[in-house]
């Protein structure tokens, strides 16, 4: 079973992430950041992973530490769940539209953390959610999952739609990248022999 549970406790946050890469898209979220809960649900549903995230953070200051640390813990859980990566597809990509918005996400489970995030949100806040936190979440995730991630919002006028297409496309690209390829069973998906 490709499952993981990671708990991360700091002076700023206490976070537990449980996930199953071979799930059905079920999720439970108690982060204290409602818009992030909505975005995490997009990852789970479109990635077909079961995801349970509990977080307590210093939200009396703002959501920065909580969102970043959820990304870190989620990345650690992903790395633990996919293990040595033998037999995985490794690469994943997706285009997702939502009305006027369109985003493209491309993933490489390379072991080399890197984020290329290209989005110009049409407003600075979605509800009470600072759009800068989208980048903080994905930076934390890629650094601890060891993946290269390219995110491009190709168009969009509604900031909620821009964010939602990014998270949906990430879920779908992740699903592709972590899918076992039966022709690669037991084989590392790299000419170097390691990732």
UniProtKB/Swiss-Prot annotation:
Keyword Cytoplasm assigned: yes
Broad EC category: lyase
SUPFAM superfamilies reported for this sequence: Ribosomal protein S5 domain 2-like
Enzyme Commission no: 4.2.1.19
Pathway, per record: Amino-acid biosynthesis; L-histidine biosynthesis; L-histidine from 5-phospho-alpha-D-ribose 1-diphosphate: step 6/9
Keywords: Amino-acid biosynthesis, Cytoplasm, Histidine biosynthesis, Lyase
One cellular component (GO) term of this entry: cytoplasm
Chief location: cytoplasm
GO BP annotations listed: L-histidine biosynthetic process
Catalytic activity as recorded in UniProt: D-erythro-1-(imidazol-4-yl)glycerol 3-phosphate = 3-(imidazol-4-yl)-2-oxopropyl phosphate + H2O
One term of GO molecular function: imidazoleglycerol-phosphate dehydratase activity
Locations listed in the record: Cytoplasm
Organism domain of life: Bacteria
NCBIfam families: PRK00951.1-1, PRK00951.1-5, PRK00951.2-1, PRK00951.2-4
Record-stated family: Belongs to the imidazoleglycerol-phosphate dehydratase family.
Protein name (Swiss-Prot/TrEMBL): Imidazoleglycerol-phosphate dehydratase
Organism this protein belongs to: Dechloromonas aromatica (strain RCB)
């Amino acid at each position: 079973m490709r499952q993981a549970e990671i708990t991360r406790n700091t002076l700023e946050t206490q976070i537990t992430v449980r996930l199953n890469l071979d799930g059905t898209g079920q999720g439970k979220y108690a982060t204290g950041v409602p818009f992030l809960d909505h975005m995490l649900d997009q990852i789970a549903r479109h990635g077909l992973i079961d995801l349970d995230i509990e977080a307590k953070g210093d939200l009396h200051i703002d959501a920065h530490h909580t969102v970043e640390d959820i990304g870190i813990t989620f990345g650690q859980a992903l790395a633990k769940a996919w293990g040595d990566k033998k037999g995985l597809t490794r690469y994943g990509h997706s285009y997702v539209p939502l009305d006027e918005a369109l985003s493209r996400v491309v993933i490489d489970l390379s072991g080399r953390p890197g984020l290329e995030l290209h989005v110009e949100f049409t407003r600075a806040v979605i509800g009470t959610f600072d759009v800068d936190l989208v980048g903080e979440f994905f930076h934390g995730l890629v650094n601890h999952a060891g993946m290269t991630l390219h995110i491009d919002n190709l168009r969009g006028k509604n900031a909620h739609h821009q964010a939602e297409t990014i998270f949906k496309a990430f879920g779908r690209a992740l699903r592709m990248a972590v899918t076992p390829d039966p022709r690669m069973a037991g084989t590392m998906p790299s000419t170097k022999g390691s990732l």
